[in-house]
């Protein structure tokens, strides 16, 4: 937990002071901190508790060395400190605890070594013992801001027979920059800090009662002659907390308590990345992967059986049998096993729109979204594959069936993206069909060479693209809503390519949710046609193109989702018995 725990004291001579603080260090300690100990002075060892190893390093400093440390410290000068304002002796390096589980160090000093942290702790100390006080001046309170951090403060009194009112004022503060985390930790911190305070007050009460029994200060003060002039009281008005509790190991114990408090509070609340339900694309990809693994297992089993039964064949025959034909390789590629080229010719939808032109791209995108067959004829296989890789981003994964490159025409039920070599003949009914679009790639004449809008990629300037269809999309046709939004995003030059990709993901998720509602409404609940029309108008998809798009995208729903909906349908007998 990134926090600082500090013990503060209100000195009658110097005001609010920080006595002791423990901070968390995630980075290695600076060179020289605790590494200059001589073997004779040694390191006192060390107690392991809860995965934390505590080192108490005591070094003997010369006066000159102590003075140099004091001058570089951001804390108050020695002349401004009394016995009650000081915790560790001059030259004491502090306490360090190593957490072996997380490689975190918990370091305790009288003041933080960093000037900015010292300022934050100093301000929190002053506020906790002056203006930010719980009613009754003893108890917990929360205050702070974004600039100086947020503070959980618990003020309390310690008995002192020589102090005004026989008690001194202290506070334990916890400082964090995360307000929500600190508020959620309030019950935990309150209980543990209250335990530390009770222990300190119990020790001080025993010392106070012993001193009162030996020399009652109340009787002595009552017998003192009254004078209207101010004078210094008898005894030491500035007593250290170690003398008030009669505990020489007080600071080591406080370091252990504060280090455990920081570790336990940080381990108590942890952040977890909560992902939502898997999208339809994720479910479809998982189903395809499972099918491929199942096929490979069955293929391996059948090969093993054939090897046991069949005789050994010559090498040439074996190689010929394992070679797949063009149709087989194309169909396997449609299952997602083909690898797109590393440097695509078409880089994005925006790039393709610049190359083809706005009217041709709109026609092509309309056919893609409607589920019609998209045929590319080109000698460049990489060009065709890059085009399909870009166009498939407009569809859900379950609606994509690709044959990247084939030497013969494949029917539309087998694929909606088909790559063909230029010499392949397309059937006449496909050429005149309104459910297909053909993109022919020809070598451009020198007179028709033109820039494609990308200075760093001139590979497409040698091509000419002709987009034809049996049912060209009219320029004044509204088209599906998602197509208009995609074009608006592509034409907005203020949006980068990455932002457009994320916008496309959001649009697909939006329309897949509409598809799920329509599927549940029509296929599962079997609602009448009138109710379906009302639902489509509510979804904002009552236009003809939107309805066709929803019906096509419905084929991309995962089997998992469909089976889940079907299994939750109540049988007529069960519903009648409930009624």
Swiss-Prot record:
Residues 287-310 form a coiled coil. Its main location: membrane. It is found in: Lysosome membrane; Cytoplasm, Cytosol; Cell projection, Cilium; Cytoplasm, Cytoskeleton, Microtubule organizing center, Centrosome. GTPase-activating activity is inhibited in the folliculin complex (LFC), which stabilizes the GDP-bound state of RagA/RRAGA (or RagB/RRAGB), because Arg-164 is located far from the RagC/RRAGC or RagD/RRAGD nucleotide pocket. Disassembly of the LFC complex upon amino acid restimulation liberates the GTPase-activating activity. It comes from the Eukaryota. Expressed in most tissues tested, including skin, lung, kidney, heart, testis and stomach. Phosphorylation by ULK1 modulates the interaction with GABARAP and is required to regulate autophagy. Residues 294-308 have a biased composition (Acidic residues). Residues 30-81, 294-337 are annotated as: Disordered. Residues 86-242 form the uDENN FLCN/SMCR8-type domain. Interacts (via C-terminus) with FNIP1 or FNIP2 (via C-terminus). Component of the lysosomal folliculin complex (LFC), composed of FLCN, FNIP1 (or FNIP2), RagA/RRAGA or RagB/RRAGB GDP-bound, RagC/RRAGC or RagD/RRAGD GTP-bound, and Ragulator. Interaction with FNIP1 or FNIP2 mediates indirect interaction with the PRKAA1, PRKAB1 and PRKAG1 subunits of 5'-AMP-activated protein kinase (AMPK). Interacts with HSP90AA1 in the presence of FNIP1. Interacts with HSP70, STUB1, CDC37, AHSA1, CCT2, STIP1, PTGES3 and PPP5C. It is linked to Birt-Hogg-Dube syndrome 1: A form of Birt-Hogg-Dube syndrome, a rare genodermatosis usually manifesting in adulthood and characterized by multiple fibrofolliculomas, trichodiscomas, and acrochordons. Patients with this syndrome have an increased susceptibility to develop renal cell carcinoma, lung cysts, and spontaneous pneumothorax. Inheritance is autosomal dominant. Primary spontaneous pneumothorax: Condition in which air is present in the pleural space in the absence of a precipitating event, such as trauma or lung disease. This results in secondary collapse of the lung, either partially or completely, and some degree of hypoxia. PSP is relatively common, with an incidence between 7.4-18/100'000 for men and 1.2-6/100'000 for women and a dose-dependent, increased risk among smokers. Most cases are sporadic, typically occurring in tall, thin men aged 10-30 years and generally while at rest. This is Folliculin. The lineage of its organism: Eukaryota, Metazoa, Chordata, Craniata, Vertebrata. The gene is FLCN.
């Amino acid at each position: 937990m990134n926090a600082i725990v500090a013990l503060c004291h209100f000195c009658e001579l110097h005001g609010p002071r920080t006595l002791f603080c423990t901070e968390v260090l995630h980075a290695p300690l600076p060179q020289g901190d605790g590494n200059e100990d001589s073997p004779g002075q040694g390191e006192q060892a060390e107690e392991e508790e809860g995965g934390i190893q505590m080192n108490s390093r005591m070094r003997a400093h010369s006066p000159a060395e102590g003075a140099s440390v004091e001058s570089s410290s951001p804390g108050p000068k020695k002349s401004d400190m009394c016995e009650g304002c000081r915790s560790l002796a001059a030259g004491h390096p502090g306490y360090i605890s190593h957490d072996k589980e997380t490689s975190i160090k918990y370091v305790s000093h009288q003041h933080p070594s960093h000037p900015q942290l010292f300022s934050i702790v100093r301000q929190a100390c002053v506020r906790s013992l002056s203006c930010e006080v719980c009613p009754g001046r003893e108890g917990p309170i929360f205050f702070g801001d974004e600039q100086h951090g947020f503070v959980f403060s618990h003020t309390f009194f310690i008995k002192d027979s020589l102090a005004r009112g026989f008690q001194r004022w202290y506070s334990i503060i916890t400082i964090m920059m995360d307000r929500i985390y600190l508020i959620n930790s309030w019950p935990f911190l309150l209980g543990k800090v209250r335990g530390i305070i009770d222990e300190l007050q119990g020790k001080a009460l025993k010392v106070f009662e012993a001193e009162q029994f030996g020399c009652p200060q109340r009787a002595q003060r009552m017998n003192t002659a009254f004078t209207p002039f101010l004078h210094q009281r008898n005894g030491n008005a500035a007593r250290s907390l170690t003398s008030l509790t009669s505990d020489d190991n007080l600071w080591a114990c406080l370091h252990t308590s504060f280090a455990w408090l920081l570790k336990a509070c940080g381990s108590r609340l942890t952040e977890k990345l909560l992902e939502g339900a898997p999208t339809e694309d994720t479910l479809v990809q998982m189903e395809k992967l499972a099918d491929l693994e199942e096929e490979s297992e069955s293929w391996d089993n059948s090969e093993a059986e054939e090897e046991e039964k069949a005789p050994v064949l010559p090498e040439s025959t074996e190689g010929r049998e394992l070679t797949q034909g063009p149709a087989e390789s194309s169909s396997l590629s449609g299952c997602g096993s083909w690898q797109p080229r590393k440097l695509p010719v078409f880089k994005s939808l925006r790039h393709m729109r610049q190359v083809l032109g706005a009217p041709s791209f709109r026609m092509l995108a309309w056919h893609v979204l409607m589920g019609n067959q998209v045929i590319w004829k080109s000698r460049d296989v990489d060009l065709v594959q890059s085009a399909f890789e870009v166009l498939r981003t407009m569809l859900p994964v379950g609606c994509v069936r690709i044959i990247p490159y084939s030497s013969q025409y494949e029917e539309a039920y087998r694929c909606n993206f088909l790559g063909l070599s230029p010499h392949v003949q397309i059937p006449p009914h496909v050429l005149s069909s309104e459910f297909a679009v053909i993109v022919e790639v020809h070598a451009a004449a020198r007179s028709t060479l033109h820039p494609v809008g990308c200075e760093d990629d001139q590979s497409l300037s040698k091509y000419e693209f002709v987009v034809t269809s049996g049912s060209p999309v009219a320029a004044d046709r509204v088209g599906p809503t998602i197509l208009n939004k995609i074009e608006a995003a592509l034409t907005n030059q203020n949006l980068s390519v990455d932002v457009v990709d994320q916008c496309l993901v959001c649009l697909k998720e939006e329309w897949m949710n509409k598809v799920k509602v329509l599927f549940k409404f029509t296929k599962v609940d079997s609602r009448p046609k009138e109710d379906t029309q009302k639902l489509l108008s509510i979804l904002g998809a009552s236009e003809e193109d939107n309805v066709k798009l929803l019906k096509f995208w419905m084929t991309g729903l995962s089997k998992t989702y469909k089976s889940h909906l079907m299994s939750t349908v109540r049988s007529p007998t069960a519903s009648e018995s409930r009624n």
